[in-house]
Structure formats: structure tokens, C-alpha cells
């Protein structure tokens, strides 16, 4: 039980442990419609969730995930819990086990076997039986017989997104005997499907991108951890910070920055913010209080690397060496899509595996080394956002210190090109920061799942003067101010040309990191004065409208097309409708009276509504000739998750 009673915020077996029951803040968990895959960067998903009211969802307590809701009578064997990185999935597992061990909850379960995928990965090449697998992880089970219904057993597989096994649910290999040997992936597949121990309960956690790796027919309930809701955010800071007046100041500061407060849905970000702001505000440190994500993460990095100077390691390793090696690891694994690493990954980046614990000690809260039940080492950064910040810092320092554009190093196809480019990179030709930024913008825009979105925001934010002052120990020279001016202009040009609302929204976040708010402020003036109807907006200005409407202090409630365009100008109304579809799908009331929606426009509208059917409550289509498109609307209304109350 000792393994689960303490919470090491942000770190494993290092730092200051806190009793879980003292700091635990109930997370907002709901039943989700499916385990379908999400191709959005998790930052976008957090922003989307922050805009949606929670009142219509039925919350589920962590300890109740295997209990049917009122009106549900089918037994629940397998639960899939999804949620973005750092949202609290693993802590929920820890709390579930602790409450069970303390005989508070779920006492009908006799045995719980927590099997994190990052530890199971270490045995991916082994052939053994399920009994043998349990004996390896839990030696005390050697005297137990779990092949029958004598025990009610729960298996917890935490971190499906970290799985490096080949889980083939189409395989014909069928195992029904716990003493029969097979590869570990076959064992797990048969256990999840129900061939092995069909009476056992199964709990799988995953980030959204991997949620569909387990077929839906094998899952009886899908839940989603949404992190902290508004009251829970404040509760966390009041528990975490003993000085309540300081806690109030920190909460007020975070609320003043929309981009920071949105991130507070993620418990790990609350911990990062508390670490930084408590130190800066309580110790009267000089310098600007962080208002952007980059500022917050850079301050956090500095606080944690300063631990180094309290230890004896500085004789062997400089800050720059340590940061560059970890940053290189972060960047390479980000490009590959990996969030956990093994010994071979460290070696590729010049990190001596025998010194890994030293790196872990130097960056206590940033990089962690874990020893699982099975003898082996697993490495990861505390949170994906820390991973992305270090990757961005590596790319930035490679350019400013070593005149290298690292994007040129990941696109080489032949040995000849590598050798040729090595000479080019080590020539006197200058690699400008604006060129690096433009390349990074293009790489991020080309990403299908937006996996470089936050990395890009960090990379651009690191070039701001205030950041260069903070990082002066690491930087050989500062960048020129006109580099950022060129980057700002390049981003504004890109906003005019891209069709994806999600990608344009991220570019506005990038402008925010660079300190440029001109487009947004211009649109805010139009909206406040009511002159937006008369204004002839450019495509980039309409993108700014979407950004402003989707990042308000209050959640969206009503969208009326006539607030944005003169009534009876149907051509312009249709044009505006197309541009504001991202806003429409986040609105509870959509008013499209007399706007001449054509079949083409209606097709786009129903597509937007279909992507978020449970949110819309009122739809007004009065005065539009719907025609054949009525079938599209019918499909939306028949969706099981549609909660439309009023249609006109």
C-alpha cells in the first residue's frame, strides 16, 4: 500500500512526497460516448473542453467507474478511461487502489494487479504464461490460484498510449488457460477480449490518440477524465499553498491570462504554476511575473535546474551540456511521437545510461527514471508540455549557439547528403532565427495531428527578449529583434492562406507568445463597437474573429449570424457562415434566420453540428429553403448524443 499512499507531484521517488489523501482534489470524470481517436493536439482538446459547460454531463466518481449509472443494468467488465497527458489518469488509478487497500471502497474486489504499459514494454520479447507474468510483477502471487472464480480480480493497464506491444485483436490465437505460454502481447489481448479470466475486471487508461487501439466491442464503458473544473482549480491551489493570501494572488494572476487559466484544467500544469508563482511571489524575486506559457515553463526549468547547484554534480557537467542532451532527446522523441524512452534512446543522444540517475537528480522535476516491478528502467519527462518546451529550447539553442537548423538534420535521405550538409552547417553561412521560425511554422502546419503546435509556441516564445535574459547562462549570443518582426509578418501572411480554423487559432497563440496582439485588438474593437457588420474583413481578420470568439472569458452561449453581417445580403451571409463554422459548433443556440443557406452551406453546417451533437440546444433555420439537405439534418437529429431541444 505504501507505493500508493504518497503522491510525488511531477516526479517519481524524488522530491517531497505528499500523502495522497491530504492533497487529492476530486477530478471531473464523465461517461464518454466512445473511445474514438482524436487527431488534435491535446492543447486544442483542453481549449475545446474549457469552452463547454459541464452542467449537462453526469459526473462519475473515480471509485464508481465499474458501477452502472441509474437506468443502466448491464454489468461492466472493461472500462476505458481516456484523457490528455497530465490530466490525472494515473493519480485516479492510485486513488482507486489506495481507497480499496484502506477498505473504503470496492471491497467486492479481492485482488488488484496494476500493470502499467511502460513496465510491460520491458517484457515485450518474453514468452510466458499469465500466471508467470503475475509472478514476475507480484512474487507474492506464487502461492495463489487465480484460474477460477475464487477471487474477484481487477487488472489495471495504465497508459495504453505508451504501449510498444503489437496488440492484434484480429489474431486467431486463442488462450483460455492461465498456465499456457505465449508472447506478452497475445496474453494481454486474450485477457482484454475475455478469453482469459472472463470474470476478471479490466481497467485501461489512455491518452485520446490511442483510445481506439482496443476495439469498441471489447469495452463496456468509456469514461473521460477532464481534469479540474472551475471550483476544483481553486481548491487545488488552496490545498497546495498553505498561505491563503498568496494562494488568492496566484489564482487572480492565472485568471488574468486566458491561455494560462485554460491550462489549469490539467493538474500537472497547476503544480508547475504553483511551483513558479509561489517562489516568485513569496521570495519577492525580481523580473516579470509569467503571463505566457513560454514564460511559465522557462521559469520552471530554471527553478529546477538550480537544484544542481545544491549538489556536487556541477564539476562534471555544465547546465548547457545537460539541457542540450535532454533537449536533443526531447526533440528526437517528439518527432518520433514517443513520450517514454528506454536505455537505447538515451544512448542515441549521448547520455550515458549509468549516469541517468544523475540526470534525474539534476532535473529532479523534469526528467524521471522509474524502476518498475520488473527489473528495468523507463525514462520520461514529467509531462508532455515539459517535453515540448525542452525540445523547443534545444532547437533554439542549436540555432543561436551553434548556427544549426535542426530541421535540416531530420530530413536527410542519404549518407552523401548528410556529409554535404554537415559541411554546410559548419560553414560560416549564418542560419537566421527568422528562417528557423519560418521552417518550424511550415512543419507545424503540415502536421496532420498538430503534434508540433505547442512546440511551435514555445520555440517562438523563447526568442522574446525577456526569455533571452532568463536564459543568458545558456546563450552565447542573443537574437536580433528584427528576427521576431519578420516572424510576425510571416505568421500573418500564413493566417491569410490557411483554411484550417484550428491551425489559424494556434498561429494566433504564437503571435501572443511573440507579444503581437494587433490583429486581435483590431477585431475586439469591431466587436465592441458593433461595426463588424459594416466592415469588409479580410480572411485573416475573419480568422481573428474566430480566435476572439473561441477564447472568451465566458463560455459561448448564442450565435446569431445577423450579428456579423447585414440582413438580406445572402451571399455575404453564406460566406460568413462558412468562416464561422468553428464558432457555430461550440454554441448552444445557433440562430440562422433568413440567411439563404444552400445545399452546399447546409452540408458544411450539418458537418459542424455532427462533430459536437451533444452541445447544441437550439437551432433556428426559419426562412431558409433547405430542400434535399433535410436528410442531413435528420441524420444529426437521430444521433444518440443529440440533445437539441428547440428546432425552428
Give residue spans per PLM region.
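Intracellular innate-immune signaling modules
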Residues: 1-648
Amino acid at each position: 500500500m505504501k507505493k500508493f499512499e504518497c503522491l510525488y507531484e511531477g516526479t517519481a521517488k524524488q522530491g517531497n512526497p505528499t500523502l495522497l489523501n491530504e492533497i487529492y482534489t476530486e477530478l471531473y470524470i464523465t461517461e464518454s460516448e466512445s473511445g474514438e481517436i482524436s487527431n488534435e493536439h491535446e492543447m486544442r482538446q483542453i481549449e475545446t473542453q474549457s469552452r463547454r459547460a459541464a452542467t449537462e454531463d453526469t459526473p462519475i466518481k473515480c471509485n464508481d467507474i465499474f458501477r452502472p449509472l441509474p437506468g443502466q443494468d448491464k454489468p461492466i467488465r472493461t472500462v476505458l478511461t481516456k484523457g490528455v497527458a497530465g490530466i490525472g489518469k494515473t493519480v485516479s488509478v492510485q486513488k482507486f487502489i489506495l481507497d480499496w487497500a484502506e477498505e473504503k471502497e470496492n471491497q467486492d474486489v479481492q485482488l488488484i494487479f496494476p500493470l502499467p504499459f511502460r513496465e510491460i514494454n520491458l517484457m515485450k520479447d518474453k514468452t510466458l504464461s499469465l500466471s508467470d507474468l503475475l509472478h514476475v510483477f507480484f512474487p507474492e502471487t506464487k502461492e495463489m490460484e487465480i484460474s477460477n472464480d475464487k477471487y474477484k480480480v481487477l487488472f489495471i493497464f495504465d497508459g495504453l498510449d505508451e504501449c510498444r506491444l503489437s496488440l492484434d485483436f484480429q489474431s486467431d490465437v486463442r488462450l483460455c488457460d492461465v498456465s499456457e505460454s505465449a508472447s506478452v502481447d497475445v496474453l494481454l489481448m486474450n485477457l482484454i477480449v475475455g478469453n482469459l479470466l472472463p470474470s476478471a475486471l479490466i481497467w485501461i487508461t489512455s491518452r485520446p490518440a490511442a483510445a481506439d487501439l482496443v476495439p469498441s466491442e471489447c469495452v463496456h464503458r468509456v469514461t473521460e477524465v477532464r481534469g479540474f473544473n472551475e471550483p476544483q482549480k481553486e481548491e487545488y491551489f488552496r490545498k497546495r499553498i498553505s498561505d491563503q493570501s498568496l494562494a488568492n494572488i496566484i489564482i487572480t494572476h492565472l485568471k488574468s491570462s486566458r491561455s494560462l487559466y485554460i491550462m489549469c484544467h490539467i493538474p500537472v500544469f497547476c503544480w508547475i504554476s504553483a511551483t513558479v508563482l509561489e517562489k516568485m511571489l513569496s521570495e519577492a524575486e525580481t523580473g516579470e511575473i509569467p503571463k505566457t506559457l513560454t514564460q511559465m515553463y522557462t521559469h520552471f526549468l530554471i527553478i529546477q535546474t538550480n537544484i544542481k547547484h545544491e549538489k556536487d554534480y556541477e564539476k562534471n557537467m555544465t547546465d548547457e551540456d545537460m539541457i542540450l542532451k535532454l533537449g536533443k532527446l526531447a526533440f528526437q522523441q517528439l518527432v518520433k511521437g514517443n513520450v517514454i524512452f528506454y536505455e537505447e534512446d538515451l544512448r542515441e543522444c549521448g547520455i550515458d545510461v549509468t549516469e541517468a540517475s544523475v540526470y534525474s537528480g539534476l532535473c529532479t522535476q523534469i526528467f524521471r527514471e522509474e524502476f518498475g516491478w520488473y527489473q528495468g528502467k523507463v525514462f520520461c519527462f514529467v509531462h508532455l508540455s515539459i517535453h515540448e518546451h525542452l525540445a523547443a529550447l534545444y532547437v533554439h539553442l542549436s540555432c543561436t549557439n551553434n548556427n544549426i537548423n535542426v530541421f535540416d538534420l531530420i530530413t536527410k535521405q542519404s549518407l552523401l547528403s548528410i556529409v554535404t550538409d554537415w559541411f554546410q552547417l559548419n560553414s560560416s553561412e549564418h542560419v537566421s532565427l527568422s528562417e528557423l521560425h519560418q521552417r518550424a511554422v511550415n512543419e507545424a502546419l503540415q502536421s496532420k495531428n498538430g503534434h508540433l503546435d505547442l512546440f511551435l509556441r514555445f520555440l517562438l516564445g523563447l526568442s522574446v527578449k525577456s526569455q533571452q535574459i532568463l536564459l543568458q547562462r545558456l546563450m552565447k549570443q542573443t537574437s536580433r529583434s528584427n528576427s521576431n518582426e519578420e516572424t510576425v509578418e510571416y505568421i500573418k501572411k500564413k493566417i491569410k492562406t490557411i483554411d484550417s480554423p484550428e491551425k489559424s487559432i494556434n498561429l494566433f497563440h504564437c503571435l501572443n507568445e511573440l507579444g503581437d496582439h494587433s490583429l486581435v485588438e483590431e477585431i475586439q474593437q469591431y466587436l465592441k463597437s458593433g461595426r463588424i457588420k459594416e466592415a469588409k474583413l479580410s480572411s485573416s481578420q475573419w480568422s481573428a474573429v474566430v480566435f476572439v470568439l473561441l477564447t472568451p472569458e465566458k463560455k459561448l452561449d448564442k450565435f446569431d449570424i445577423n450579428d456579423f453581417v447585414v440582413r438580406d445580403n445572402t451571399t455575404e451571409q453564406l460566406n460568413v457562415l462558412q468562416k464561422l463554422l468553428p464558432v457555430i459548433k461550440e454554441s448552444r443556440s445557433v440562430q440562422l434566420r433568413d440567411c439563404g443557406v444552400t445545399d452546399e452551406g447546409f452540408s458544411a453546417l450539418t458537418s459542424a453540428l455532427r462533430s459536437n451533437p451533444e452541445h447544441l440546444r437550439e437551432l433556428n433555420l426559419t426562412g431558409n429553403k433547405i430542400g434535399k439537405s433535410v436528410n442531413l439534418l435528420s441524420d444529426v437529429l437521430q444521433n444518440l448524443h443529440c440533445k437539441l431541444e428547440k428546432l425552428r
